[in-house]
């Protein structure tokens, strides 16, 4: 029995779920073969569903999309902004084809191709004692003054690990938002500081650039990568999704 009709709405039984997954795999295989044949003919076409984490999307997509649309007019590009856990689930369930993520955050079953390093900077309030410094060591940061992203954002996890404070890290502020811009606005009106990626630096107004401080050498960067599920074969579409 493939359907459980005793439930409202009707749902698939355990056996039914297996059959449905096999059917999905067959359809994916058919689509992949068809598109691979087109690639062998030298034609890059089809649909590319791309997921992007919130700490990349605002700073990279507007540079990437115009050239992509111009260079690959036969590719239908669909972009979704989502946190890493949702990206992993979407990749495994074939809801997206690829994603731009921080390397090392997707876990088993996902392949990553690293693209570039993205350094971290401190963004420090003029009211904070570290404001007068041009270079800051991580151990000098008072964790009570550090504002970070809400749970679900992989950059939050990276910052917590960087500060070696894990789940117990105290903070005056925590936001249910993936917005680095919000964190910087909070820093502007408090005595706090936050940590931002290099790709966000060019969008900071010139009158606030003095709040940017370099971090001492060490684990003070992330690697940006393209991620796909292991069974994905549309390699030419993945190649063209790499920002230049």
What are these regions (language model features)?
Residues 236-244:
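Residue-level detector of conserved catalytic or cofactor/ligand-binding positions
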Residues 123-127, 223-234:
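A bilobed periplasmic-binding-protein/Venus flytrap-type ligand-binding module shared by bacterial periplasmic
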Residues 19-41:
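Alpha-helical linker/hinge and terminal dimerization helices associated
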Residues 97-101, 192-197:
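Paired acidic/hydrophobic, glycine-rich loop segments that form the ligand-binding mouth/hinge
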Residues 75, 85, 89-93, 107-189, ...:
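C-terminal regulatory
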Residues 1-14:
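A short LG(V/I)-centered, amphipathic sequence patch enriched
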Residues 45-108, 176-177:
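Central regulatory/effector-binding core of bacterial HTH transcription factors
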């Amino acid at each position: 029995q493939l359907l459980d009709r005793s439930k409202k709405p009707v749902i698939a039984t355990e056996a039914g779920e297996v059959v449905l997954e096999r059917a999905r795999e067959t359809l994916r295989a058919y689509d992949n073969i068809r598109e691979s044949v087109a690639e062998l003919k030298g034609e890059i076409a089809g649909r590319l569903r791309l997921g992007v984490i919130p700490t990349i999307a605002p700073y990279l997509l507007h540079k990437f999309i115009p050239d992509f649309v111009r260079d690959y007019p036969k590719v239908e590009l669909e972009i979704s902004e989502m946190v890493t856990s949702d990206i992993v689930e979407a990749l495994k369930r074939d809801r997206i084809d690829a994603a731009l993520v921080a390397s090392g955050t997707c876990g088993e079953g996902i392949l990553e191709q690293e693209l570039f390093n993205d350094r971290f900077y401190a963004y420090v309030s003029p009211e904070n004692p570290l404001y007068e410094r041009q270079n800051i060591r991580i151990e000098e940061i008072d964790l009570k003054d550090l504002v970070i992203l809400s749970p679900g954002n992989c950059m939050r996890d990276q910052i917590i690990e960087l500060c070696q404070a894990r789940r117990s890290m105290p903070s005056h502020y925590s936001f249910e938002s993936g917005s680095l811009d919000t964190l910087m606005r909070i820093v502007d009106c408090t005595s706090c500081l936050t940590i931002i990626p290099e790709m966000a630096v060019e969008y900071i107004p010139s009158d606030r650039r003095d709040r940017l401080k370099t971090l001492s050498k060490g684990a003070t960067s992330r690697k940006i990568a393209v991620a796909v599920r292991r069974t994905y074969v549309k390699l030419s579409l993945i190649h063209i999704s790499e920002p230049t």
